[in-house]
Each structure stands twice: as C-alpha cells, then as structure tokens.
From Swiss-Prot:
One of its GO terms (molecular function) is iron ion binding. The keyword Lyase applies. Fe cation binds at H54, H58, C124. The keyword Iron applies. This is S-ribosylhomocysteine lyase. It comes from Lactobacillus acidophilus (strain ATCC 700396 / NCK56 / N2 / NCFM). It comes from the Bacteria. Belongs to the LuxS family.
Length: 157
C-alpha cells in the first residue's frame, strides 16, 4: 500500500490552528502543484460538526480563490479538523495563513445565508447538511486562537 504523508504526521505534536505545506509535486512539464494542510482544530481533541464544516467548505471554495492565485480545490479532511488546499504553483505558509484568516473573518463577520454558494438540491449533493450559524461560531473560535504559519510552533500571523 502506498505511503500517505498525512498518515505519517504525528498528530500529537501539531498545534492547531495552523497552515502547513504538505508537499510540492512537479509534473512532467515542470508544472508545480502544492498541497497545504489547513488545520482548524486540534486533532483528536475536537471536530467541526458536518453542517458547519460543509458550509465553511462551500465558502472557502470561493473566498480562497478571491485571495490566492491558482486554487484548484479546498476539501475537508474526513476527521473534520480542517482542509486540504491544492494550488498550482507555490505560496508561502504565511501567505496562505493570511488568506485563510481573512476568509474566516469574512465568514464570521459579514457572510449571510444568501452569500453561501451551492445550497440547493440542484447545486449540492447534500444540500440539507449546512449550518451558517455553526460555521460562524467555529470561525469565531478558530480566529480567537489565531492561525499559525507553522504547525509545531505557534507563530500566529
């Protein structure tokens, strides 16, 4: 079975919330794709409920694209503690952390239900499982802790 980097990470050593560069892969023509760990809550101590996580996912899909070039995808971890962010090229963890912080601030402060994309039966595969209230509450809690650009040392941006 292939070795997956995420499953070799010592989850007891990280200090969430943080942004971590997992890997930079280079394609046959030299194109680079970077994978980031956007860890919002401490592993094995908490998990974001699916309704809130789902709403944060839909909002980050747009908000991160507004703030970073080359966003390919932002997908939640099955453990519900954060997201994978996949981008063309490379960004520093500080740059990604600033974009994430700004996005979470917008969710917390200004987003209304009408702003949440993909919440109908035609536009979402599980449209009933959303909660903007839960998303806002978790964004508030995450931002109160501060987002670090280092997974092992608290270097809050």
């Amino acid at each position: 079975m292939a070795k997956v980097e995420s499953f070799t990470l010592d989850h007891t050593k990280v200090k969430a919330p943080y942004v971590r560069l997992i890997t930079v892969e280079e394609g046959p023509k030299g194109d680079k794709i970077s994978n980031y760990d956007l860890r919002l809550v401490q592993p094995n101590e908490n998990a974001i409920p699916t309704g809130g996580l789902h709403t944060i996912e839909h909002l980050l899909a747009s908000l991160l694209r507004d703030r970073l070039d080359g966003v390919i995808d932002c997908s939640p971890f099955g453990c519900r503690t954060g997201f994978h962010l996949i981008v063309w090229g490379e960004h520093s963890t500080t740059e990604v952390a600033k974009a994430l912080k700004s996005s979470l601030e917008e969710i917390r402060d200004t987003i209304t239900w009408e702003d949440v994309p993909g919440t109908t039966i035609k536009t979402c595969g599980n449209y009933r499982d959303h909660s903007l209230f839960t998303a806002k509450e978790w964004c508030r809690d995450i931002l109160e802790k501060g987002i670090s650009d280092d997974p092992f040392e608290r270097n809050v941006i």
